[in-house]
Amino acid sequence: MAGALRKTMIYLGLADGDEHYESEQSVATHHDEERPQAQEREERRAPAPVREVVREMPTVDAEEEYRAPVTPIKRAASSREDASGLRQITTVHPRSYNDAKVIGESFRDGIPVIMNVTDMGEADAKRLVDFSAGLVFGLHGSIERVTNKVFLLSPSYVEVIGDDKKASETQASFFNQS
């Protein structure tokens, strides 16, 4: 076992191979050749003088230094500029909760949606309003009640101006989630 470990150490360069061969030789032969081998080993083990190579780096003046050309960065159009191109509003009269897909896709595309739930039952209407509230929350929009069962879903860049805000807050009986 020690022989296998020793061979592995020699193979990996962790031990000298000469010592391994010495142990295999007989004692008599070892005494006769001890001095010449010891001198050879010391000669082999003596580190060779290392020449230092020093390269001088050329000095570069600041004026001669290469500079890449500067590329101006164009500013992206803000969402307020996109709002000036707003030309469309989607009006949806859902009959069931399955019509939520049309509402979600239109709003996701940045189109304001007017949702009229007067033709729906109360349970489905509440579900659709809850869906719409989550939709506008996730896409940073806003939802406003226009009448008792009509709602406006507007994207974040659309500003709705109206005088009836306080009047609509007093009529909050239908969708009060208490």
Swiss-Prot record:
This is Cell division protein SepF. The keyword Cell cycle applies. Homodimer. Interacts with FtsZ. Its main location: cytoplasm. It comes from the Bacteria. Gene3D superfamilies: SepF-like protein. One of its GO terms (cellular component) is cytoplasm. Cell division protein that is part of the divisome complex and is recruited early to the Z-ring. Probably stimulates Z-ring formation, perhaps through the cross-linking of FtsZ protofilaments. Its function overlaps with FtsA. InterPro entries: Cell_div_SepF, Cell_div_SepF/SepF-rel, SepF-like_sf. Residues 21-46 have a biased composition (Basic and acidic residues). GO terms for biological process: division septum assembly; FtsZ-dependent cytokinesis. Residues 21-65 are annotated as: Disordered. It is found in: Cytoplasm. Keywords: Cell cycle, Cell division, Cytoplasm, Septation. Belongs to the SepF family.
